[in-house]
């Protein structure tokens, strides 16, 4: 499925960021709370990249399109009584970087820090609060909601955005992957901070998480680090498996008229699972096409 491929892609990107040249050994285990861990020891630079990936993307929106994206956007905007400014300043003082993002099939929260214990430990403690004690302040929720609504109106003027939305809807039909991560103006307007808190409590849990660690730490250190982050989260339950994507019975063409000087053409079909024996042949072939 998409999520497995995305998690492995994230791991690959993190490896490149730490200048790994040889094929690394990927260690994997599960914490007592049920979080899956992927770890690569990379000693080239005195830093560590940590990313917690949750099955909490737009495919989990249901009839509240946009809730996954807004929930993720509010992480780091207020946690454990700290404001967004206080959180950002604290990470900056330690030379650490907080990141987050959300797509159709996953959402994540990340930390990059130097491995000096005087910097790493307090960064991890703050990261744990952002991860597990998000406040979703009303003022920040209203700001992000308005920003999303402005973005949705802007997308209505962009041929690329119009085409992309139509493409996913045509390709996936009633499947959850058809849901646009940004939602619609109607659904986003109807969302409340309470909706975000409920989504957060359901999906940002240990059993629904994959912890990716790459950097200048030993496996023992990584085990302690992963356990501390997983322990900060409620155990929860893993999100149910999404239904398989149906294959197209036949090709079809969709045309959308739009006043523009250029035409945008999107073409595609549901792919194959990563475990398929032909996956890498198709992957390379797709890159050859550009």
Annotate each predicted stretch with a short phrase.
Residues 160, 165, 193-229:
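Non-catalytic, conformational "gating/processing" segments within enzyme and secreted inhibitor domains
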Residues 17-19:
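N-terminal signal peptide c-region/cleavage motif recognized by signal peptidases
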Residues 84, 88-89, 135-153, 218, ...:
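Acidic/histidine-enriched alpha-helical segments
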Residues 1-8:
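Bacterial N-terminal signal peptides that target proteins for export
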Residues 40, 45-71, 84-130, 145, ...:
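M16 family metallopeptidases and their MPP-like homologs
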Residues 21-47:
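N- or domain-start disorder-to-order transition segments that initiate the globular core
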Residues 23-30, 87, 169-209, 240-246:
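Histidine-acidic residue clusters that define the catalytic metal-binding segment
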Residues 173, 177-181, 210-273:
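An aromatic/glycine/proline-enriched structural segment found at the starts
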């Amino acid at each position: 499925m998409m999520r497995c491929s995305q998690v492995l892609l994230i791991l690959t990107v993190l490896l490149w960021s730490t200048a790994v040249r040889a094929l690394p050994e990927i260690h994997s285990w599960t914490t007592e709370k049920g979080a899956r861990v992927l770890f690569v020891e990379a000693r080239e630079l005195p830093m560590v990249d940590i990313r917690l990936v949750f099955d909490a993307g737009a495919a989990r929106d249901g009839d509240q399109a946009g809730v996954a994206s807004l929930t993720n956007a509010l992480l780091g905007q207020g946690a454990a009584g700290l404001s967004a400014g206080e959180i950002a300043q604290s990470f900056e003082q330690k030379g650490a970087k907080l990141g987050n993002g959300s797509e159709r099939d996953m959402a994540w929260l990340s930390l990059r820090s130097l491995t000096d214990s005087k910097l790493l430990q307090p960064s991890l403690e703050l990261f744990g609060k952002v991860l597990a004690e998000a406040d979703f302040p009303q003022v920040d929720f209203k700001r992000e909601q308005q920003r999303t609504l402005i973005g949705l109106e802007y997308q209505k003027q962009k041929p690329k955005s119009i085409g992309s939305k139509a493409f996913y809807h045509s390709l996936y039909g009633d499947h959850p992957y058809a849901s646009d991560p940004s939602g619609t103006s109607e659904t986003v307007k109807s969302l409340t901070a309470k909706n975000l808190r409920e989504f957060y409590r359901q999906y940002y849990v240990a059993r629904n998480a994959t912890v990716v660690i790459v950097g200048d730490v030993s496996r023992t250190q990584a085990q302690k680090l992963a356990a501390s982050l997983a322990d900060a989260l409620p155990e929860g339950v893993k999100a149910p498996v999404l239904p398989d994507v149906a294959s197209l019975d036949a090709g079809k063409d969709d045309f959308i008229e739009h006043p523009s000087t250029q035409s945008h053409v999107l073409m595609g079909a549901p792919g194959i699972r990563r475990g398929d024996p032909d996956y890498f042949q198709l992957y390379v072939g797709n890159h050859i096409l550009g």
